[in-house]
Amino acid sequence: MNEDNHESSSSGCDNQIEFLVSEAEQRRRRVNHLDTEVHGLGYDPFSYCGRRVHVLLLTKLISVLTIPFYVAIIIFISFFGNATSVMFSVIILGSVLISTCYGAFRGAKMCLIPFVIIQLVFLIYDLILITILLLAVVFPKMFLSALLRLPLEDIPFGTDQVLLGCSLLLALLLAPLVWTTHVVYIDFLFISQVDETLHMLKEANQKVSQDDVSPNRMMF
């Protein structure tokens, strides 16, 4: 009787092992098939420059290159703002910079969110400034236009040329703002996908471990 139970439990264990192996093989074939299709199409949503540069590397470069950009903003505010605005800019930009560098180099996706938010704020602020400068050029008799032209009266250049030049410089910042925000957001999606995959693998390993333990209990 015990031998029959031992044989039945052994056969059940063998069947479970064969089922797990066959299921893993089918998953491996599906992954290989999808990977072959992706390589055949030459498309990778997490790579740039012909799949030569990964989004992780780009995010690290962006986190480092934003340091002089944020420093320039703080210096600009120190010339035209008061001590309170400088203090708040140092606190906000410094915390965002530290969070972005940590998230880029440590793979912490939640630390990348402040960078995306402040980039969107910069983008909206840039668009508003461009609109104001263009309105000041198109409608020179507006009260806002008079306020903008008053500090420019002593400049040897024409006020319209100065306003158009400033709007052009602000327009040139739109592309870097949009691109860096896009790259960091894609990195956020990549880290989320990696975390989800690792969580699924952990659950699969726990399930396999439970399936391996249960036949041993039956045999005992």
UniProtKB/Swiss-Prot annotation:
UniProt keyword Membrane present: yes
Membrane topology: Multi-pass membrane protein
The keyword Membrane is assigned to this record: yes
Keyword vocabulary terms for this entry: Membrane, Transmembrane, Transmembrane helix
Protein localization: Membrane
Transmembrane annotation, as ranges: 61-81, 85-105, 115-135, 150-170
Principal place of residence: membrane
GO cellular component: membrane
Paired cysteines (S-S): none
Full protein name: Uncharacterized protein B0416.3
Organism of provenance: Caenorhabditis elegans
Classification of source organism: Eukaryota, Metazoa, Ecdysozoa, Nematoda, Chromadorea
